[in-house]
Each structure stands twice: as C-alpha cells, then as structure tokens.
C-alpha cells in the first residue's frame, strides 16, 4: 500500500502573551499530531514555560516504496516550537516488483550543491521510484524552530529522497539535526542495495546560508572512502543558526562580526567536547554552527547532539535545560 500524507502546523504568539500556540493544524493520510505540550520549566525568562512541544506521529511506522510525506511548519513572530518524533524513522526496502524499475546508471547520482531556487523535489536526484519526505518551514522575525527528529534508519533495498528547506526571516533562529543510520547492524544487515538522497537548504530572506545535497547509490565508494563515511554506518549533522539580533544592528550585515560571535560559541562547544569526550567535530560558516558525528553508535551521536543543544539554548536563548521525555521512552 502507498501512503500519501501531509501535515501542516502553524504557530503564533500573542503580543501580550509568552505562550506559543498551535493555532492551525491540518493533515491528510497518516501523518498527525495529538496535542500541543508545554513541559518546559518556569524560569527567570518567563517565556520558557510557553515553548510549544509537538510530537509528529506516523502510525505506519515507516516509509517504503513510493510513499510521499509532506510536512509544512509556519512560525509567526515570537513563537518558539520544539518538534520531534516519538521514535526512529524507518525507510524500508522496496518490494521486489519495484527494484528493477530504477535505472542502473549510477553516474546520474552526484554530490554537491545545486541551485536552490527551484522547488522541484528531485532536481538533483535521478528519476527513480522512491519513498519521499519533504519538509518546508517558514519562520517570521523573532521565531525559533527546533526540528529535532530521532534517527532515520535506512534498510537494505530502501530508495529514499528527503528534502528539508527552511526559510528564515532576518531575526529568526533555527536548530535542526539529521541522524542517518545505514543498515541494521544488530541483524548483520548492511545498506548494500538501494539509493540514498538527502538535501538540506537554509535560507535567510533571499540569502542561501546552507546548501547540502547528497545522492548516492548503495555500495559506492562514498560509503567506504575517508572522504565519505569511511566504512561507518551512522552519520549525524546538526545545524544551529542564530538570530542576527545577537550582534549590534549596524553590524548585522557584516558576516565577520557574526563569525566572531559564533567563534565564542564554538569555543564553548569544543570545551564541552573535550570535557565530556564527545565524538563530535564542529565548525561554522560565518552564518551558523555545524556539528557532525561519524561512527557506529547512534545513541552516542544523539546524546552528544543533545548536550550541544542544551549549551546553545543556554547561551543564545537563556533557557534552562530541558529534555523531551519522549527521547527516553
């Protein structure tokens, strides 16, 4: 059975209130949410208790064949939403009847940055029958989105396409991570057959801040080369984009000044990495911070990202630590 599912979530924050409200939600198919949660503590910053937490539910528990999932997030000014998932995402192997419908020419799979002006879902991927997930998020001024899904597991014979696009107003801020697990090592199953395609774009108004596009056929050298995954099967990438308000208004268009602010955050992250022996590397591109994991332990990746997230939330947003309970169930 093929699932075509969509989910729209719109958030706002009244000017006289500190509580973010999920004021609109609409869904088709199996994608859904239950209700908005407000689990964060009261703090010296009274707005922390008003941060809205959402769990995205997908009852089929996995994506396969030519399923298509579309998620749209719209955050109005001053809203702050934490959106996550209750468990790992699973990209299942295709049915045998579909495995032979895709081209065998792996030369059509390329790595690199593509023009982000097109909204065509597969314009940097070859045409194959694939399961797809598309995420489109728009953040108004002073909005904060934390899109922090749990890991995605790519089964042998899975054919996947994921597109993640974030459009930020000048003073919006974003925290987002993606953790990919190739194969199921506990079952001695590797990602030996299939295709993996993943794109991330982060825009600030008309400026493209981040563009990553990976499209690889299983068993290519990208999975074994030191320039790729180096024979590891867990890869994580965490991007943190601050509001431009962190620097003086007259300097907001100067990337070097924002870079100096990010340098200070990077120094604190590296101190955390050293003291906690976290298996993470981090850097910045003068617009945002990127932390990466490459290894064999998905929980080590997740816990390291969590600790870095708490440091960033404290430094940038003056928030006390809070861990969504769903991450421990």
From Swiss-Prot:
Select a single GO molecular function from the record's annotations and give it: nickel cation binding
Q: Is rRNA-binding a UniProt keyword of this protein?
A: no
Q: Which domain of life is it from?
A: Bacteria
State the residue spans of region: Disordered. Answer: 100-120
Indicate where this protein resides in the cell: Cytoplasm
> What InterPro entries does the entry give?
UreD (IPR002669)
Compositionally skewed regions (Polar residues) per UniProt: 103-120
The entry's keywords:
Chaperone, Cytoplasm, Nickel insertion
Q: A single Pfam family, by name? A: UreD
What GO terms fall under cellular component here? cytoplasm
Keyword GTP-binding in record: no
> What is the documented function of this protein?
Required for maturation of urease via the functional incorporation of the urease nickel metallocenter.
Which family does the entry's similarity section mention?
Answer: Belongs to the UreD family.
Subunit structure, per the record?
Answer: UreD, UreF and UreG form a complex that acts as a GTP-hydrolysis-dependent molecular chaperone, activating the urease apoprotein by helping to assemble the nickel containing metallocenter of UreC. The UreE protein probably delivers the nickel.
Q: What is this protein called?
A: Urease accessory protein UreD 2
């Amino acid at each position: 059975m093929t699932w075509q599912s969509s989910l729209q979530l719109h958030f706002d924050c009244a000017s006289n209130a500190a509580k973010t409200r999920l004021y609109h939600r609409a869904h088709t198919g199996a994608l859904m949410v239950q209700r908005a949660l407000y689990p964060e503590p009261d703090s010296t910053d009274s707005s922390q208790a008003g941060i809205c937490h959402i769990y995205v539910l997908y009852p089929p528990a996995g994506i396969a064949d030519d399923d298509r999932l579309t998620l749209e997030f719209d955050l109005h000014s001053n809203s702050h939403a934490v959106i996550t998932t209750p468990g790992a995402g699973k990209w299942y192997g295709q049915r045998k009847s579909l495995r032979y419908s895709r081209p065998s020419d792996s030369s059509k799979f390329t790595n690199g940055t593509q023009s982000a002006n097109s909204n065509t879902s597969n314009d940097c991927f070859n045409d194959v029958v694939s399961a797809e997930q598309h995420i489109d998020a728009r953040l108004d001024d002073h909005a904060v989105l934390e899109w922090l899904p749990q890991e995605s597991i790519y089964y042998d014979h899975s054919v996947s396409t994921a597109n993640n696009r974030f459009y930020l107003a000048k003073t919006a801020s974003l925290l987002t991570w993606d953790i990919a697990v190739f194969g199921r090592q506990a079952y001695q199953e590797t990602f030996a057959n299939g295709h993996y395609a993943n794109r991330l774009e982060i825009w600030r108004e008309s400026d493209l801040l981040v563009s990553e596009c990976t499209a690889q056929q299983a068993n290519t050298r990208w999975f074994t080369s030191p320039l790729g995954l180096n024979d590891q099967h867990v890869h994580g990438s965490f991007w943190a984009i601050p509001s431009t308000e962190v620097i003086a208004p007259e300097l907001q268009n100067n990337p070097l000044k924002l870079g100096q602010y990010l340098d200070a955050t990077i120094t604190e992250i590296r101190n955390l990495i050293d003291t906690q022996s976290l298996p993470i590397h981090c850097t910045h591109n003068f617009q945002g911070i990127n932390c990466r994991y490459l290894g064999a332990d998905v929980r080590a990746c997740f816990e390291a990202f969590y600790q870095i997230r708490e440091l960033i939330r404290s430094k940038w947003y003056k928030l006390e630590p809070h861990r969504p309970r769903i991450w421990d169930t």
